[in-house]
């Protein structure tokens, strides 16, 4: 080996010793292909770097042949004369230096919001990913940050830890610095009643915050429009420019209340004059609830059709079964309360009242027919014209049977006849009777056999305490054992059996409970009195010729014969 070659090798050896991993050097781009960028850093050999390290966010190669770039040494020449270089690490090193200088000097940097993480957002500042806490996104808390994603926004670096690869930035710091002067000017000129423009920056369930330029104003949901607004997002969207009136301004607390609906005339003014009670008009269903439907009768004016005012007969139906959102319906003004901004509307009032129609076409005592709609513990409902029902109470099913027994004979869907007993249009009630189709056997019987009458019947059933006497096919009387004879009877079964004929006097009539009490003892006493009266009359007629004893014997003998 010549001395010249040895000197060259020695110089290269010294040069390599000075190039350590992690050092940043300059290299020239000498070739670019599909997979690699070839650079010459003045080393023994050229180096290949992955082409991906030279592409921007759009996937475009940022360099061309002849450009000089900074690269970082990852490893020095190995036994094959190769040195591994990295463009990416060099860029990151430069970006870290820029971040450190920006933090030290308080400079403002730009970055792109590229993701959402727990507690905040991630920001790409060149090749460094930083963290933006949710509390530092704005000068006020921001509930929805989705509109920031993908946007380039300015920040300040407030925390830096290169070892842990941790960078924290603040957008709030930038806003507070830049909005200070704007806020001061705005606060000096802001007045209640003035009209101001702003940008919607955040939407919540209860309203929206509007950036007025240095200070935020609250636009409450109730001040968005005169009509009902379910959610502010129906009217507003983030980033939208709006015009509003300053309703209230607290300079000390720097709070501003805004209103959009106040820019227009209150549609409730003079509403009762425009729509007198009983007015019929058409409106559009704007909202449905469990208790009714809201109908917009003009722009910004809604009224409630309560579920009970939707249909004459279907009172428990869900409003969605009757109308749908957007339906045009005819309604009647029932009541307007301008003070409370409430309107009561009715839909059924625009239709014929089936109760009034029934009352106009039927009178008390009329016979009707209909199908059994339902059977309850208190009676039978019968379907009537117009989709309404009439009630046959248990007590009006049968003259002779109890209501509980009589109701078992009826089935749902069965056609029945009944008599109209009463019509109450106001309460929407119609009383019917089935037993009234026939005469009252009990009433007919006691009309000719009242208290004190002598009646005959047969024993239907008997026990120790008394007997049930069939006085006719449909009327019964009760004979207590104590009323069988003047002498005490301990067990009436020793005196009577089923089928025996009995003659007795009616001693009690209970029309309310429809019961008759009988007495054989009273019948015997009555006959004895009549016999005595007859004897006395004969004695008076034959005074002086015949003794009382003879007359009584004669009377008794005649009765026995």
Curated annotation (Swiss-Prot):
Keyword terms, alphabetized: Repeat, Ribonucleoprotein, Ribosomal protein, RNA-binding
Biological process, per Gene Ontology: translation
NCBIfam families on file: PRK06299.1-2, PRK06299.1-4, rpsA
Family designation: Belongs to the bacterial ribosomal protein bS1 family.
The protein's name: Small ribosomal subunit protein bS1
SUPFAM superfamilies, per database record: Nucleic acid-binding proteins (SSF50249)
Gene3D superfamilies xrefs: Nucleic acid-binding proteins (2.40.50.140)
Note: Present in outer membrane vesicle formulations which are used as vaccines in human.
Function: Binds mRNA; thus facilitating recognition of the initiation point. It is needed to translate mRNA with a short Shine-Dalgarno (SD) purine-rich sequence.
GO molecular function (one): mRNA binding
Superkingdom as given in the UniProt entry: Bacteria
Residue ranges of domain S1 motif in the record: 22-88, 106-172, 193-261, 278-348, 365-435, 452-521
GO cellular component, one term: cytosolic small ribosomal subunit
